[in-house]
């Protein structure tokens, strides 16, 4: 008896019928409407979050205000002072009151110095307003698709910023520009070749003042001295940054700029805290374990760095480009290293 199995014959009709019974809908055509297409919900949410962060990081500039009202009040006050001085001189000469004439001359001299100082402050305040208008104009050129305005605009910005024609970056930018470039491309090249050099100097200034403020607060035993010291260092930092970007500041314009910086820090606080809160808390915890004064110094250093970066954003002639924007993380590392080196010394 053979151990081999007998052959089995399968019919095609049976196979087809079985296949049809198992999967009757495999060959059926099915169309999808637009409502049934796949939608990447997570990507959209990430894009919305990114847009919200960018909106928070935008620079908030002060409003122009009533320029004509301020100029009119100053002109009226100056006219009244001159009128009063001339009338007093004529009256003193007619009555032969030489003592009154001397007092009139003395008071007129003091008033002229005061008017000159006030006029100088108003002029510097006007230049600061013009600087903000230049920033707005640069943003409009970057967002537009125009051609032919970018080179003249950048040359005007270079003149206002005190960039010399012999500057290597400015000379390289002029040689790189050709008529085929759009205004946005010309401004991007100017930012990468000229403004980036100013950014490097400004970043060094911010880093230096932040680390020095943190170190001074960490070793200072007096809270009142800390407050005065930090305020003086911050004003000095803003003055140095304004010189780097060629913005001349007076007393009134310095106060206006500082107020604008605080407004920007408050507006962007939510976004920055969401990004940097963990690192700040980690740094504060590290310094707090070493000493309480080190923790205070580290907090002051980070606050000074934030103040400096917001000042840079307001003093730059062009808006930040994301790939070249100075981040707080690099400066924070230097502040932490400085405070740690001071507090860990035996």
Swiss-Prot record:
Keywords: Cell inner membrane, Cell membrane, Membrane, Transmembrane, Transmembrane helix. The chain crosses the membrane at residues 73-93, 98-118. Residues 1-28 are annotated as: Disordered. It is found in: Cell inner membrane. Residues 1-17 have a biased composition (Basic and acidic residues). One of its GO terms (cellular component) is plasma membrane. It comes from the Bacteria. It is a multi-pass membrane protein. Coiled coil: none annotated. Its main location: membrane. Pfam families: DUF697. Belongs to the UPF0283 family. PANTHER family: UPF0283 MEMBRANE PROTEIN YCJF (PTHR39342:SF1). NCBIfam families: hyp_HI0043 (TIGR01620). This is UPF0283 membrane protein VIBHAR_01918.
């Amino acid at each position: 008896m053979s151990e081999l199995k007998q052959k089995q014959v399968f019919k095609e009709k049976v196979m087809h019928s079985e296949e049809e019974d198992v999967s009757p809908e495999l060959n059926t055509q099915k169309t999808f409407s637009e409502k049934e297409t796949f939608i990447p919900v997570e990507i959209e949410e990430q894009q919305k979050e990114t847009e919200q962060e960018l909106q928070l990081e935008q620079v908030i500039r002060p409003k122009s205000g009533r320029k004509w009202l301020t100029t009119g009040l100053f002109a009226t006050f100056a006219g009244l002072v001159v009128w009063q001085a001339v009338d007093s001189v004529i009256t003193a000469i007619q009555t032969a009151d030489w003592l009154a004439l001397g007092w009139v001359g003395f008071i007129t001299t003091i008033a002229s110095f005061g008017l000159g100082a006030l006029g100088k402050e108003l002029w510097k305040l006007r230049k600061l307003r013009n600087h903000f208008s230049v920033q707005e104009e640069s943003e409009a050129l970057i967002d537009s698709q125009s051609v032919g305005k970018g080179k003249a605009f950048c040359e005007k910005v270079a003149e206002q910023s005190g960039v010399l024609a012999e500057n290597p970056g400015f000379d390289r930018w002029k040689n790189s520009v050709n008529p085929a470039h759009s205004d946005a491309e010309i401004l991007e090249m100017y930012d990468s070749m000229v403004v980036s050099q100013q950014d490097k100097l400004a970043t060094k200034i911010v880093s230096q003042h932040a680390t020095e403020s943190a170190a001074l607060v960490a070793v200072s035993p007096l809270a009142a001295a800390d407050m005065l010291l930090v305020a003086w260092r911050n004003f000095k930092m803003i003055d140095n940054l304004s010189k780097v970007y060629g913005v001349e500041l007076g007393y009134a314009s310095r106060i206006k700029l500082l107020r604008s910086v605080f407004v920007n820090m408050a507006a962007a606080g939510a976004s920055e805290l969401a990004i940097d809160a963990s690192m700040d808390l980690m740094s504060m915890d590290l310094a707090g374990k070493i000493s309480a004064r080190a923790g205070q110094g580290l907090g002051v250093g980070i606050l000074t760095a934030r103040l400096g970066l917001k000042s840079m954003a307001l003093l730059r002639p062009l808006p930040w480009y994301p790939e070249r924007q100075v981040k707080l993380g690099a400066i924070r590392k230097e502040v932490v290293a400085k405070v740690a080196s001071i507090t860990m010394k035996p």
